[in-house]
């Protein structure tokens, strides 16, 4: 006998959290029916898109078998009598009217966060077999937030001239292109021959270089080792127009990441680093130079790769001073190969964790994206928390303009053919933060950040972004 699952909601926008819930519903049932609240449904003004457009958005999903309009939820459930009613995990500790109805006929109310291991957005794009332009992909996002191509171009131009102070871990990225030779006859080892080596400034250094490339006056504060990689990085930063206040730490080498690549694929990455905390004396030097320069900047960016630059006391002193000067402050704490913690940066204006980093921060691998966003917000007291989802784009959950409700939305990934995904988060962080510092609302800022990420992943290695590059991607 066919098992029916029912999911209901507003669905002003179908984001990654919904897609994962739909997929889970199909895994536990034979048929998925989605109920969309009618325009007349009393939701205190939270319905922002006409029911016809919302139906079209949900119906196009590959996991949805049927869509119904809900004028009265209780009547709809009594008429349909679904075997399972599925809701997001964030509803599990709330009062749910469905519980009173479903017991009447013996159904089940279940909660799920959706599995983040698979890229549902990428899967949908593959099913559709099409590749939309950037403008085609963001048309709905533009409409929902009253944006336009001209307004986004205006934001991109307005970030020029900002004064940006970046603090964080300096990294040198090496790319060694190799020619595959074959498999060793002695053991199952891939044998390659090096052909060409390229070196780029990475880590927080490229965040500062991106800021300079986008037209800002960029200052970078960090540490490096007393070695050739450190000297090469400092010289590169100077050539890229970054004012570098980088202190020598004789207790560590300059952090270096070497990627061995063949035929456009990375075979192996070797990290050379020390991640112990820098000593108190050096930490005080960094803190003091930042505090001395705060008043002459518009934006502070904390770029934490967990290699020892930041102490909790340093973060507290700088953020407290930033608030006194009414500065925009943004932070990212990466957990790709290291173990970062974005909750180390409370009370800033913007944080940009990946989904993995957000889940690690609140120790929750089960809740949906809305639930995770709420938990991170409560842990950090930060309102603007775009969560980056890789090939699924960016998800943002924040208070609406009246502060009475919440708005969820998603910008899809804007580059389907990435060359090198490393550095995408850095590009997103700096472009989003600079947009906010220029006065843009968070929706415009996240769109600009997404365009910047699309530009970055389209090339190998870290090269600074430019405003012309962002505008060209927006037109593509």
Describe each region flagged by the PLM.
Residues 6-18, 167, 192-201, 308-309:
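Short, glycine-rich nucleotide/cofactor-binding loops
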Residues 15-31, 200-214, 319:
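Histidine-anchored nucleotide/phosphate-binding helix
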Residues 277, 296, 313-328, 335-347, ...:
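Conserved phosphate-binding/catalytic region of the ribokinase-like
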Residues 31-38, 88-89, 219-224, 329-333, ...:
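Short internal beta-strands
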Residues 10-11, 90, 169-170, 305, ...:
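Active-site metal-binding loops of divalent metal-dependent hydrolases
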Residues 1-144:
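Nucleotidyltransferase catalytic core that binds NTPs
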């Amino acid at each position: 006998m066919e098992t029916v699952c029912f999911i209901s909601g507003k669905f002003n926008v179908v984001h990654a959290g919904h897609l994962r819930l739909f997929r889970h519903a199909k895994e536990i049932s034979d048929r998925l029916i989605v109920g969309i609240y009618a325009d007349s449904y009393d939701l205190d003004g939270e319905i922002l898109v006409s029911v016809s457009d919302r139906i079209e958005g949900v119906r196009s999903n590959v996991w949805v078998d049927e869509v119904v309009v809900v004028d009265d939820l209780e009547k709809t459930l009594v008429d349909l009598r679904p075997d399972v009613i599925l809701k997001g995990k964030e509803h599990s500790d709330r009062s749910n009217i469905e519980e009173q109805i479903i017991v009447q006929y013996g159904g089940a109310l279940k909660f799920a966060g959706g599995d983040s291991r698979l890229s549902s957005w990428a899967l949908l794009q593959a099913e559709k077999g099409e590749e939309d332009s950037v403008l085609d992909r963001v048309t709905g996002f533009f409409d929902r937030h009253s944006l336009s191509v001209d307004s986004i171009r205006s934001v991109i131009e307005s970030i020029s001239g900002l004064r940006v102070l970046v603090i964080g871990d300096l990294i040198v990225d090496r790319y060694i292109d190799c020619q595959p030779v074959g498999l060793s006859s002695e053991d199952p080892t891939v044998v390659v021959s090096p052909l060409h080596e390229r070196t780029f400034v990475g880590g927080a250094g490229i965040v500062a270089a991106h800021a300079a490339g986008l037209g800002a006056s960029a200052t970078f504060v960090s540490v490096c080792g007393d070695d050739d990689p450190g000297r090469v990085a400092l010289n590169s930063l100077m050539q890229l127009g970054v004012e570098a206040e980088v202190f020598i730490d004789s207790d560590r080498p300059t952090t270096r990441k070497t990627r061995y690549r063949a035929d456009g694929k990375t075979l192996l990455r070797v990290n050379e680093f020390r991640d112990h905390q820098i000593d108190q004396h050096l930490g005080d030097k960094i803190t003091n130079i930042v505090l001395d320069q705060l008043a002459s900047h518009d934006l502070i960016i904390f770029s934490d790769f967990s290699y020892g630059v930041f102490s909790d006391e340093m973060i507290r002193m700088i953020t407290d001073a930033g608030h006194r000067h009414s500065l925009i402050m943004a932070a990212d704490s990466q957990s790709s190969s290291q173990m970062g913690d974005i909750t180390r940066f409370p009370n800033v204006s913007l944080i940009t964790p990946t989904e993995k980093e957000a889940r690690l921060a609140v120790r929750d691998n089960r809740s949906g994206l809305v639930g995770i966003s709420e938990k991170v917000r409560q842990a950090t007291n930060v309102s603007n928390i775009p969560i980056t989802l890789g090939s699924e784009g960016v998800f943002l959950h924040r208070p609406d303009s009246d502060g009475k409700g919440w708005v969820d939305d998603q910008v899809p990934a804007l580059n389907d053919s990435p060359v090198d995904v490393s550095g995408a988060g850095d590009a997103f962080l700096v472009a989003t933060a600079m947009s906010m510092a220029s006065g843009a609302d968070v929706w415009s800022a996240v769109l600009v950040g997404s365009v910047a990420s699309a530009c970055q992943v389209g090339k190998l290695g870290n090269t600074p972004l430019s405003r012309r590059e962002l505008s060209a991607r927006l037109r593509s």
